[in-house]
Amino acid sequence: MKTVIMTSHRSLTKIPLMMDGKMNKSEENVGTLPLPTLKRLGFLPEDFDGSKYTSQSWTNYINSIGMGKALYVQTLAEPIIQQLNHEAIILDYKKWATIGMKPWLNARQLVLSKIQEHLGIGMYSAREDDQIVEHARRKGVRIPSLNFQWLIEHRNDAPIIKLLLQKKNLDMKIFQWSKLSKFQNRDGEVSLSGAWNGYSSYSGRFTARNLAMAALPKEMRQCYRAPRVRGKPGVYLSLDANQIELRLLAGAAQATRLLGQFQNGIDIHKYFTSRLLGIPEREVTDTERKLGKSLVYAFLYGAGKSKLDKIITKSNMRIIQAPSELLTTLYPQLMSLVDSFRDGNVLYYALQPTNVEPRIGPTWMQSSSKQNLPVQSATSMLMKQVMTQINDKVKVVNVIHDEFICLCCFDEVDEIKAIIQDGFVQATRSLGMALPASNLLEATILGGYA
């Protein structure tokens, strides 16, 4: 093994490169991966100059730090992800402008009316941010900045600040998604597509630039217009993997109670919330369940006590036990695994330990990132492996974190769901993961079909 000193702008980083290693199954494809992807797979800083190193060097280094499986999955998935650059979701823009955006337009009108009433001004003034600021000043409320961050931080200082923030949020959404009008074809259709990055973060998530396909508004889904498929009416089919992070953690930790709950179709968030609030499960409301779900995922993604306290305070609900204590009581094996991520001396990726310290170049990771990355990366790797399993059977047009959006015939919905369900089972087995697969996929037809 040869130690090579690689220089970044910030520091010298010692990287062990097995320069005399033999070519393995990743070597023949690693050269096709973009350099930023290789750097992220190697947990190297973005400004690291890796252009002078060979594919063999990259392969050996990434294998040596325990990221060989991630590299192999990425080499298989990268061309499939890049195929998404040539796929699109068809939007009926007229329907979107008249029906889809209507809830936003109605909400904006309501906010403007409240601003009028609160400040005693006309509709013209209520539409103008500067006028709102001036009239608020006359009533003793100073708003020195229209910056979103300032408004968010001070939204509870005065009702008019919260109303102004709501107005600006709605203005931004309406403006952003109205711009699609210029992309209509003669049939009033807009093709929604993005430029995909197969490894956009250190967790391995793949995302679309230009148009953020993962951020398409839910209100838009009723306005999609699927083309015909093999002469039959087509549909866009959403297949969402329910609670994939919790499932992967339950499998990795062999969390007995949690595995049983998934197997039996128990509503885990309602179960947790009932014990958090000290009420029967049947009495848990949707709002209360939402609090429980927010706390579970905030904790699993690395939130500390102060963040959890803020979520609870904002809800105005009374809890009888701290969320972290309750999770430890209910799911001790899962919490033990999460603690190993947070407290370990090495970085975990896809729920398994690597051979590297938890840092990117000279910058050490915060505890929350050490806890978050193993879960996020496991989901990303599994979704990529599923794509390789189903690529020749299913036409995927978009991927949103743990959700596949596919184009298929209207009478193929059950068949496509079964194929993707089997894809998860096969992918889990290939990666050596454990995933409770009962009630895994939720199928939804998006919009209508031609």
For each feature predicted by the language model, list its residue ranges.
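Mixed-charge, glycine-rich, non-catalytic linkers/tails in nucleic-acid processing enzymes
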Residues: 3-16, 24-125, 253-263, 333
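Extended, well-ordered alpha-helical scaffold/bundle regions in very large, multi-domain proteins
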Residues: 69-160, 301-338
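Acidic, glycine-rich two-metal-ion catalytic cores of nucleic acid-processing enzymes
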Residues: 2, 11-15, 19-20, 24-25, ...
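Short cationic amphipathic helices and targeting signals
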Residues: 306-308, 402-407
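Short secondary-structure junctions
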Residues: 390-395, 429-435
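Short glycine/threonine-rich loop-to-helix capping motif typified by GTGT followed
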Residues: 105, 407-415, 448-450
